[in-house]
Amino acid sequence: MSANEFYSSGQQGQYNQQNNQERTGAPNNGQYGADNGNPNGERGLFSTIVGGSAGAYAGSKVSNNHSKLSGVLGAIGGAFLANKISDERKEHKQQEQYGNSNFGGAPQGGHNNHHRQDNNNNNGGFGGPGGPGGQGFGRQGPQGFGGPGPQEFGGPGGQGFGGPNPQEFGGPGGQGFGGPNPQEFGGQGRQGFNGGSRW
């Protein structure tokens, strides 16, 4: 059981030490919950070890003089990359569990329950008629309107969250809510800010 699962489950066990004697054969009574069916910690350690060793091998092969420094740097880079890949796979797996939890309809427009995750389906919520504009805050990417599939229409409503990729929070006014892919917010007349500027 990971630390996150442990603390979010509300099942913080109790530690009962009895004169440093180990109880054998006694039932566990749920005090030390071992989650043998879900060895995520072992998988993370395994991916770190494999990534580190692959990085060390690649680092030593890239270097002409086979220095230890290039091997160590390769190991660190490989372990880091392996952990990033592992995290992305966990996010993708978690996202598939909640894949189609999109709600929509006027007057709020669509609402996508994913917060900055990429599931590559076009299930953005349906929006109502185009809102009165306002300002949207996004990072980089093309401007567009949210909505399902290629129609890409925004809807009215207050502030809310967009779908995955570079969408950010909606600003004041009646912006519609975007779906997945690089769609951004906007109201009437494609108002919304996408550039690299920040507020």
Curated annotation (Swiss-Prot):
Superkingdom as given in the UniProt entry: Eukaryota
Region (Disordered): 1-48, 89-199
Polar residues composition bias: residue spans: 22-31
Alphabetized Pfam families for the sequence: Rick_17kDa_Anti
Biased composition regions of type Gly residues, renumbered to the chain: 124-163, 170-179, 186-199
Name under which the protein is recorded: Uncharacterized protein YNL208W
Entry annotated with the keyword Phosphoprotein: yes
Chief location bin: mitochondrion
Modified residues annotated as N-acetylserine in this record: S2
Gene Ontology CC terms: mitochondrion; outer membrane
PANTHER family documented for this protein: EXPRESSION LETHALITY PROTEIN HEL10, PUTATIVE (AFU_ORTHOLOGUE AFUA_1G06580)-RELATED (PTHR37014), RICH PROTEIN MS8, PUTATIVE (AFU_ORTHOLOGUE AFUA_7G05650)-RELATED (PTHR37014:SF10)
Phosphoserine modifications at: S53, S70
Compartments in which it is found: Mitochondrion
Biased composition (Low complexity): 7-21
Keyword Phosphoprotein listed: yes
Record key words, sorted: Acetylation, Mitochondrion, Phosphoprotein
